[in-house]
């Protein structure tokens, strides 16, 4: 505590009351050293012994001595009372109010988002976001809207300016991104070509029975081409990534795939999803007609067969909540063993074709996620008519590539999106579509332009400091856990210490020569949008295949710099924060740190906690999947997490329950991230002193921290989009990301004085980290 120099303290000093002042300042020493009969310099004797001897001493006093003792006692008591009052005044004194333009602006934004008529102890999400929700209905052309969307819109506008500015590019790779974007914007040329580019591609691949004759014996060839050259994944997905059990090497990985709809649930719960299934079939028929299929009566039965085949795939697909234990689903086999497991595919020719020029032999290691799925999909392929198999593979190609064609295909997409996600049809500016597609495919190529335009030089250092504070806070909490044994705790701390931070962008993109080297084999052609997209699919697979004989590289990010997101990589044990998210509302230099810790601080804590969620905890500090926990702590962890499974499973949206097991990892990260960020903010205040408060709000800085956290998640969704999120998204709905985390926080309840048993302060709370 800082010394307070008040007018009363000055007056006491001026009175020359040296004896009393000295006694007060040395009070602790006096109590420790006094014994019976100790005498002070003023001749006053004080005795702490038995009351009987004290009574005898008092009786022996003269009346003058007695009056002096009483007077001294009263004066001492008065002084103590004054000092106590000063201390209370200091403790409760309201910090100064920040009245800068930035503080007034952020206050206005906070107030506009809030609904102060809602009791924060009843429903904090509505209290924090009620005003925002009323002012932000889902915009036309969207199925959901939130603070992330606002920031992405801002980033899109920046990217548009850069792509349209010829002087913004320095490297050849950046210029390729600009050529790609301009080709997308050339609607005149796209409308001239109509469906011709895709129809020619279909013919080149042997035809499609829906639009014309097809080559009847080309199953293996078609599968190889659509997988490698056009990045589709019929039946299963094949990719290259770090080996979970040997993270220093890359390995071929095979997993379940092949559904046209976002989840198996859409196919299997037919009554609930009848509208979507009908809309999907109509969409399939419409694309078939646009590609020259002719009579709808001839197209619809064949499209229904494709839909039925996808339903059969959905039946053998493993639900996501049953795939969370990676130790159980990881299987390493050889190419020869894979051939025995799934004989419907000629695996060696298939792998040698898609990974050319890398040579694959029978001993090639391959990681398979879920052997039973591959066994059953092989049987399904063998038992299915060849014409239907070809129709299905070509449908995968059409579904992936039709959006690069003329407006008729865009209209068909929009009509299905309205059924699927509740998206209202609207005339979204073409540039937004083209910016998104260019960023999605060539985000690293345009990355340097975006970084130079938006990312301040010291942002990496500031973000690094915040990450360091969050790590420290997480490790402090780790040291207090009662359910974890000491050996596992030490290993967990080592893992936390070893987490690598990647901030803003991968270093190679800022070196024009290095960037050009990466994109050297990709060529964008002026005014041929479809061709450019197909070339990119082929190029991106070649880049993937090229990694097979190389070691994993930290500079290979899974997100581009403009992305408004962040992630944790278990095999690299690293957390990644693209430049796109290091902006308001997550971080602003001029905002109180309560908001910054509640924003980007919680994001950092969230990603850090992923290293210790139900999946991340299975990886050690070097990124290897192995059992490094003692069994007692594994069982205790499962007990702690079961609480969260039950808690979140009790939440529902429009009468549909949240899947607490499917969302477990994200819920652990949300709760752990909030706790770590709050603790880090308290450490910051201890080090730097209390912050200025914001005007009008009447909130303390601690309350502002929780409010800032909640307002990051203000969002709205259509009912259709909410349904899709509940069955596909590993994150809980935004409302419950706020309510679930805060209702588990004792500190939140204390700062908002929520009565025990109130909705935001339940008696039973869940805590893992």
Curated annotation (Swiss-Prot):
Question: Superkingdom, according to UniProt?
Answer: Eukaryota
Any single Gene Ontology cellular-component annotation: perinuclear region of cytoplasm
Q: Which InterPro entries match?
A: MetalloPept_cat_dom_sf, Peptidase_M13, Peptidase_M13_C, Peptidase_M13_dom_2, Peptidase_M13_N
Record carries keyword Chloroplast: no
Alphabetic keyword roster = Cell membrane, Disulfide bond, Glycoprotein, Hydrolase, Membrane, Metal-binding, Metalloprotease, Phosphoprotein, Protease, Signal-anchor, Transmembrane, Transmembrane helix, Zinc
Give yes or no: UniProt keyword Transmembrane: yes
Q: Which residue intervals are topologically Extracellular?
A: 89-769
The portions of this protein that span the membrane are 68-88
The record ties this protein, via CDD domains, to: M13
Stretches assigned to the Peptidase M13 domain:
97-769
Subcellular location, in the record's words?
Answer: Cell membrane
One example of the protein's molecular function in GO is: protein homodimerization activity
**Which purpose does this protein serve, as stated in its record?**
Converts big endothelin-1 to endothelin-1.
Family to which this protein belongs: Belongs to the peptidase M13 family.
**What is the protein's quaternary organization?**
Homodimer; disulfide-linked. Interacts with PPP1R16B. Interacts with TSPAN8; this interaction recruits the endothelin converting enzyme ECE1 to tetraspanin-enriched microdomains and positively modulates its enzymatic activity.
The protein's name: Endothelin-converting enzyme 1
């Amino acid at each position: 505590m800082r010394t307070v120099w008040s007018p009363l303290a000055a007056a006491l000093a001026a009175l020359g009351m040296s004896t009393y002042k000295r006694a007060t300042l040395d009070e602790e020493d006096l109590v420790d050293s006094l014994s019976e009969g100790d005498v002070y310099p003023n001749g006053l004797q004080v005795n702490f012994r038995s009351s009987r001897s004290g009574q005898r001493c008092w009786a022996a006093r003269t009346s003058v001595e007695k009056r002096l003792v009483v007077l001294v006692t009263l004066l001492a008591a008065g002084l103590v009372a004054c000092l106590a009052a000063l201390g209370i005044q200091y403790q409760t004194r309201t910090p100064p109010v920040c009245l800068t333009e930035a503080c007034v602006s952020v206050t206005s934004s906070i107030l506009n988002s809030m609904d102060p008529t809602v009791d924060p102890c009843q429903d904090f999400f509505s209290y924090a976001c009620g005003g925002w929700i009323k002012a932000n209905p889902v915009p036309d052309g969207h199925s959901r809207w939130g603070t992330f969307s606002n920031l992405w819109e801002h980033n899109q506008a920046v990217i548009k300016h850069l792509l349209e500015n010829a002087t913004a590019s320095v490297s050849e790779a950046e210029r390729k991104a600009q050529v790609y974007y301009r080709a997308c914007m050339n609607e005149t040329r796209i409308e001239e070509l109509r469906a011709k580019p895709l129809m020619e591609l279909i013919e080149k691949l042997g035809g499609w029975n829906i639009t014309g004759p097809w080559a009847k014996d080309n199953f293996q060839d078609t599968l190889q081409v659509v997988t490698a050259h056009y990045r589709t994944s019929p039946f299963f997905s094949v990719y290259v990534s770090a080996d979970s059990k040997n993270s220093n090497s890359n390995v071929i990985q095979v997993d379940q795939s092949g559904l046209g709809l976002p989840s198996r649930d859409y196919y299997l719960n037919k009554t609930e999803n009848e509208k979507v299934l009908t809309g999907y079939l109509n969409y399939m028929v419409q694309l078939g007609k646009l590609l020259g299929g002719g009579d709808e009566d001839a197209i619809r039965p064949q499209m229904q067969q494709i839909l039925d085949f996808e339903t059969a795939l959905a039946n053998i697909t493993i639900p996501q909540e049953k795939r969370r234990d990676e130790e159980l689903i990881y299987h390493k086999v050889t190419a020869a063993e894979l051939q025995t497991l799934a004989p419907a595919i000629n695996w060696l020719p298939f792998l040698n074709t898609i990974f050319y020029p890398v040579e694959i032999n029978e001993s090639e290691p391959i990681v398979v996620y879920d052997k039973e799925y591959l066994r059953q999909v092989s049987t399904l392929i063998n038992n299915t008519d060849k014409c239907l198999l070809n129709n299905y593979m070509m449908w995968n190609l059409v579904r992936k590539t039709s959006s690069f064609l003329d407006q008729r295909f865009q209209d068909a997409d929009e009509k299905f999106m309205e059924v699927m996600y509740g998206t209202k049809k609207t005339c979204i500016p073409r540039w937004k579509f083209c910016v998104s597609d260019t960023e999605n495919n060539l985000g690293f190529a345009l990355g340097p332009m975006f970084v130079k335009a938006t990312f301040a030089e010291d942002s990496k250092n500031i973000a690094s400091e915040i990450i360091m504070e969050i790590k420290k806070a997480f490790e402090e909490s780790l040291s207090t856990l009662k359910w974890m044994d000491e050996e596992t705790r030490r290993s967990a701390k080592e893992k936390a210490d070893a987490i690598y931070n990647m901030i803003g962008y991968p270093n190679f993109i800022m070196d024009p020569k290095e960037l050009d080297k990466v994109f050297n084999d990709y060529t964008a052609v002026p005014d041929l949008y479809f061709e450019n997209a197909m070339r990119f699919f082929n190029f991106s697979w070649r880049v993937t295949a090229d990694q097979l004989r190389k070691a994993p590289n930290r500079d290979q990010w899974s997100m581009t710099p403009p992305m408004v997101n962040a992630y944790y990589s278990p095999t690299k044990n690293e957390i990644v924060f693209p430049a796109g998210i290091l902006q308001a509302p997550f971080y602003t230099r001029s905002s109180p740190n309560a908001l910054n810790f509640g924003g980007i601080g919680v994001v950092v804590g969230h990603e850090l906690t992923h290293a210790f969620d139900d999946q991340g905890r299975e990886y050690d500090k070097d990124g290897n999947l192995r059992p490094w926990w003692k069994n007692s702590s594994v069982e205790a962890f499962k007990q702690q997490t079961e609480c969260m499974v039950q808690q979140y499973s009790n939440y529902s949206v429009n009468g549909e329950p949240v899947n607490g097991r499917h969302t477990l990892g994200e819920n652990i990260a949300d709760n752990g991230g909030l706790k770590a960020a709050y603790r880090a903010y308290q450490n910051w205040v201890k080090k730097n002193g209390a912050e200025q408060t914001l005007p009008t709000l009447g909130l303390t800085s601690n309350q502002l921290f929780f409010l800032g956290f909640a307002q990051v998640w203000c969002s709205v969704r259509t009912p259709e989009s909410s349904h899709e999120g509940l069955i596909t998204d590993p994150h809980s709905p935004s409302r419950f990301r706020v309510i679930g985390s805060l209702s588990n926080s004792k500190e939140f309840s204390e700062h908002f004085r929520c009565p025990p048993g109130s909705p935001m302060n339940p008696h039973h709370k869940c805590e893992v980290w």
